[in-house]
Amino acid sequence: MPLNLPDKLPAIELLKEENIFVIDTSRATQQDIRPLRIVILNLMPLKITTETDLVRLLSNTPLQVEISFMKIKSHTSKNTPIEHMQTFYTDFEQMRNEKYDGMIITGAPVEQMDFEEVTYWEEITEIFDWARTHVTSTLYICWAAQAGLYHHYGVPKYPLDQKMFGIFEHRVLEPFHSIFRGFDDCFYVPHSRHTEVRREDILKVPELTLLSESKDAGVYMAMARGGREFFVTGHSEYSPYTLDTEYRRDLGKGLPIEIPRNYYVDDDPDKGPLVRWRAHANLLFSNWLNYFVYQETPYNINDIE
């Protein structure tokens, strides 16, 4: 089914080249159904890349989906053209009276800072609280998952001795949970982070359910409020060459970086990546949209509370 994207968003042409079905707003207005309203708070530096990664996965949906992009006022993006931000992004203050069927909050390159030291911490925690009464289900990814767990439930994060970098095997702890419908017993997820949350801290919080973990990468997914909040520590949305780009970037800067684990064919960067996470990434996002957004959201969006 199609995604309804803002007219002229760069991701439209990129995804059409991949045979992904998208339509722009002009065409969507001719279809007489209520689309699911999804807002994305994109905190990643390379915003166009992240937009494309997420939109690619959101395209596999049962209904028309209308995508909006939110930005925070207390931070200015240095890696995305200002014209792009002005055209496609809206400040939270201008969106606070809106309601949405679903929300995705991305990671951010601030994980090695204490949460309270992040310049936009006050604003983003206000958004976390706002989402609880204005969004049917919120998907927190990577740093946002750590930040949401800390803000809502007091779960701390811990520095890692070595960056968690590569593709790791995970297991499903709740096999009959709807978020895992169609999943294999084990599945693969990209990780790229310097910090972690720990299972013992998750298990101490009665409101949290630990859904998936990895013997190497640790906690992968936790849920709260009956599926109104999901906290995902990995990057299922990553495209095939994202880790390769990060690896070569850090090599070029002379930073200490290991080859991403379980990623390249024969662990040889010259042979390219072996993609093992794409199918489960699509299942994750389609299951979230279907079972926790579409099936749960009221027809009258103003009834969300």
Swiss-Prot record:
Site (Important for substrate specificity): residue numbering on this chain: S192
In what pathway does it function?
Amino-acid biosynthesis; L-methionine biosynthesis via de novo pathway; O-acetyl-L-homoserine from L-homoserine: step 1/1
Q: Output this protein's name.
A: Homoserine O-acetyltransferase
Q: Which UniProt keywords apply?
A: Acyltransferase, Amino-acid biosynthesis, Cytoplasm, Methionine biosynthesis, Transferase
Q: GO biological process annotations for this chain's record?
A: L-methionine biosynthetic process from homoserine via O-succinyl-L-homoserine and cystathionine
Its UniProt entry gives the catalysed reaction(s) as: L-homoserine + acetyl-CoA = O-acetyl-L-homoserine + CoA
| Organism of derivation | Bacteroides thetaiotaomicron (strain ATCC 29148 / DSM 2079 / JCM 5827 / CCUG 10774 / NCTC 10582 / VPI-5482 / E50)
Can you tell me which family this protein belongs to? Belongs to the MetA family.
Site (Important for acyl-CoA specificity): which residue positions? E111
